[in-house]
């Protein structure tokens, strides 16, 4: 049975964010702002339905989905694109594949104790973020 990811998580650290943003062709100005951010994550997980909110002082992003059901994801507020997205469980990892202009794009969430890990991929870039559960 997959873990329940419901909770509010505070940013702890990240690695390789600039390479990830470059792989998405994000402008230099926006990359510089993004590298200063320490986003929080809020996840609501009820059965197969999930809402994931990324909250920061610059921009917030919310995605809602049903696990295993493909949907069109509007990422215009993130990088100006739309893509076809599907999120599935691979054992205890929540795995997202985003099909569109950028190859090998997606993310993976998993828990280790009170820590939430997020691995973001685009092209050959991999960014790792770590969050701590606060409630």
Swiss-Prot record:
Single GO molecular function: fatty acid binding
Stated role: Intracellular transport of retinol.
Keywords per UniProt: Cytoplasm, Retinol-binding, Transport, Vitamin A
Protein name (database record): Retinol-binding protein 5
Gene (name only): RBP5
InterPro entries: Calycin (IPR012674), Fatty_acid-bd (IPR000463), ILBP (IPR031259), Lipocln_cytosolic_FA-bd_dom (IPR000566)
The record's note on its domains: Forms a beta-barrel structure that accommodates hydrophobic ligands in its interior.
Lineage: Eukaryota, Metazoa, Chordata, Craniata, Vertebrata
GO CC annotation: cytosol; extracellular exosome; nucleus
Family: Belongs to the calycin superfamily. Fatty-acid binding protein (FABP) family.
GO terms for biological process, alphabetical: fatty acid transport
């Amino acid at each position: 049975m997959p873990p329940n990811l419901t909770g509010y998580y505070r940013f702890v650290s990240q690695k390789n964010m600039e390479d990830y943003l470059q792989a998405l062709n994000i402008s230099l100005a926006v990359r510089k702002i993004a590298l200063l951010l320490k986003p929080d994550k809020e996840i609501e997980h009820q059965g197969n339905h999930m809402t994931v909110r990324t909250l920061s002082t610059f921009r917030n992003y919310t995605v809602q989905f049903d696990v295993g059901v493909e949907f069109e994801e509007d990422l215009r507020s993130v990088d100006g694109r739309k893509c076809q997205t599907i999120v599935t469980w691979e054992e205890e990892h929540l795995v997202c594949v985003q099909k569109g202009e950028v190859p090998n794009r997606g993310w993976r969430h998993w828990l280790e104790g009170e820590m939430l890990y997020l691995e973001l991929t685009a092209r050959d870039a991999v960014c790792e973020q770590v969050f701590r559960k606060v409630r």
